[in-house]
Amino acid sequence: MAASKDGCGVGEVAAGNGRRLHLGIPEAVFVEDVDSFMKQPGNETADIVLKKLDEQYQKYKFMELNLAQKKRRLKGQIPEIKQTLEILKYKQKKKESTSSLETRFLLADNLYCKASVPPTDKVCLWLGANVMLEYDIDEAQALLEKNLLTATKNLDSLEEDLDFLRDQFTTTEVNMARVYNWDVKRRNKDDSTKNKA
């Protein structure tokens, strides 16, 4: 099987070479010389090597599925955070006002309720896991801006990891094709020597 180098975590840089490691995704090493590669211990037959490469390919597919799910979740969170920040900025402007704010809020799909919100300098934010906390508007805005920055960085990191993973797919597929072609040539060569004998 192609050699692999394991990374440690998000945003870490490999010692010495200055490259970012990708979520512990093992790097597929391109097989330059198939003959010498097939002579390595554990690479007795092309079938064994192809099976190992296919297992590695399936692992990459599984990793891609997980990263794609994380990406979808982040792409859904970022607009929600931005919308909440816009609402907080509006509340910040209206904080000194004495009149109450008339609004409609979503109860369920296509079902809204009308509400009158008195002037306040406090807001409640859903933190997840059925937890809601009350914050000052400034604290809530700082928290949401930090969360938006983190979510954006994570999304960028996921994009890089998915690109890296696509490169590993390609390398593994090319390695599989090279080993398969090597085996076909070897068998044709064996058949031609048997026919001559």
Curated annotation (Swiss-Prot):
Q: Where in the cell is it found?
A: Cytoplasm; Nucleus
Entry's Gene Ontology cellular component terms = cytoplasm; cytosol; nucleus; prefoldin complex
Task: Show the CDD domains listed in the entry.
Answer: Prefoldin_3
**N-acetylalanine modification, residue list:** A2
State one Pfam family annotation.
Prefoldin
Q: Which of UniProt's keywords are assigned here? A: Acetylation, Chaperone, Cytoplasm, Nucleus
Name the major location.
cytoplasm
Query: Which GO-annotated molecular functions does the record name?
Result: tubulin binding
Gene Ontology biological-process entries: microtubule-based process; protein folding; tubulin complex assembly
User: What InterPro entries has UniProt attached to this entry?
Assistant: PFD3, Prefoldin, Prefoldin_subunit_alpha
Q: N6-acetyllysine is carried by which residues?
A: K59
Task: Summarize subunit and interaction data from the UniProt record for this chain.
Answer: Heterohexamer of two PFD-alpha type and four PFD-beta type subunits. Binds to the C-terminal part of VHL.
What exactly does this protein do?
Answer: Binds specifically to cytosolic chaperonin (c-CPN) and transfers target proteins to it. Binds to nascent polypeptide chain and promotes folding in an environment in which there are many competing pathways for nonnative proteins.
Q: Which family does it belong to?
A: Belongs to the prefoldin subunit alpha family.
List the protein's name: Prefoldin subunit 3
UniProt source species: Bos taurus
